From Swiss-Prot:
The keyword Oxidoreductase applies. Inhibited by pentalenolactone (PL). Coiled coil: none annotated. Induction: In the absence of pentalenolactone (PL). It comes from the Bacteria. GO terms for biological process: glucose metabolic process; glycolytic process. Pfam families: Gp_dh_C, Gp_dh_N. Keywords: Cytoplasm, Glycolysis, NAD, Nucleotide-binding, Oxidoreductase. This is Glyceraldehyde-3-phosphate dehydrogenase 2. GO terms for cellular component: cytoplasm.
Length: 334
């Protein structure tokens, strides 16, 4: 059965999701997009991307639609998600990627409009279930979970990074720093922002700011709830981020044992979600990598009970591929 998808919000993540679905999945069909932008602009930004390059098929704007190759995708422009005709369009799953409707009560409006499930492409509040694939997706219950959060890109990287290490040697406590690409929540030039650090020009500064990944990890790995803390450093790159996790372990270990644990995970149960590399990478090397976490073996350190591990991630493309994987998982039980 082909699962019919609607995308609410056609910004960076919405367009990346569209590209990922087109590149990977014959099981999913994007049938409609809702965004307040004008159709010619939306079509142009899908066709030409500063990071991903040109779309591999011809993209043209039509009245109320975008034509991609031989497919026509309906375009809606509705502010109220409850007014969207998902049922009339036969949409099974809505990917909520506006960044606005992250509260489950608001996201549930998509269900009122006829969708069967909603995936929030962000950390959420009041959701039925928060999932990180490879970590807790086995707990998904289609009978109980309708509004599902895919957590954040950082939580997807940290979740895999932490679970492999916790399963191998046990994590007692730890600190995480994500060195993260700038996002649209920041300013191109100095301008007012509720976070005074984010008020500063994104392309000119290293910007310390908060990260909810450590708190969110408790939702997907309850045994680590309250054991990790975190913050972020936003840096002047458009995509390509890295998680630096330093923990106190419950037993002694070695660099070799830690690396072996990640190598086994990457070639086994985490294949496709976790990649293992020995090469000396920089951030542009992982742009376009679909993995949740690219483990950088050469940066592994052990000092007494402390272990440092580092995982790269394309915060747009990797995360969007997880959204496609999650939609496929949910769709398999509709």
């Amino acid at each position: 059965m082909t699962v019919r998808i609607g995308i609410n919000g056609f910004g960076r993540i919405g367009r990346n999701v569209f590209r990922a679905a087109a590149a990977r999945s014959s099981e999913l069909e994007i049938v409609a997009v809702n965004d307040l932008g004008d159709v010619p602009t939306m079509a142009h930004l899908l066709a030409y991307d500063s990071i991903l390059g040109r779309f591999p098929e011809e993209v043209t704007a039509e009245p109320g639609a975008i034509r991609v190759g031989d497919r026509t995708i309906k375009v809606l422009a509705e502010r109220d998600p409850g007014a969207l005709p998902w049922g009339d369009l036969g949409v099974d799953i809505v990917i909520e990627s506006t960044g606005i409707f992250t509260d489950a009560a608001k996201a549930r409006s998509h269900v009122d409009g006829g969708a069967k499930k909603v995936i929030i492409a962000a950390p959420a509040s009041g959701e039925d279930f928060t999932v990180v694939l490879g970590v807790n997706d086995g707990d998904y219950d289609p009978e109980r979970h309708t509004i599902i959060s895919n957590a954040s890109c950082t939580t997807n990287c940290l979740g895999v990074l932490a679970k492999v290490l916790h399963d191998a040697v046990g994590i007692d406590s730890g600190m995480m720093t994500t060195v993260h690409a700038y996002t649209q929540d920041q300013n191109l030039q100095d301008a007012p922002h509720k976070d005074l650090r984010r008020a500063r020009a994104a392309a000119l500064n290293i910007v310390p700011t908060s990260s909810g990944a450590a708190k969110a990890i408790g939702l997907v790995l309850p045994e680590l709830a309250g054991r990790l803390d975190a913050f972020a450093l936003r840096v002047p790159v458009p995509t390509g981020s890295v998680t630096d996790l330093t923990v106190t372990t419950r037993r002694g270990t070695s660099v070799e044992e830690v690396k072996e644990a990640y190598a086994a995970a990457a070639s086994g149960p985490y294949k496709g979600l976790l990649s293992y590399v020995d090469a000396p990478l920089v951030s542009t090397d992982i742009v376009g990598d679909p993995a949740s976490c690219v483990f950088d073996a050469g940066l592994t350190r052990v000092s007494g009970p402390q272990v440092k591990v580092v995982g790269w991630y394309d915060n747009e493309w990797g995360y969007s591929n997880r959204l496609i994987d999650l939609a496929t998982l949910i769709g398999s039980s509709l």
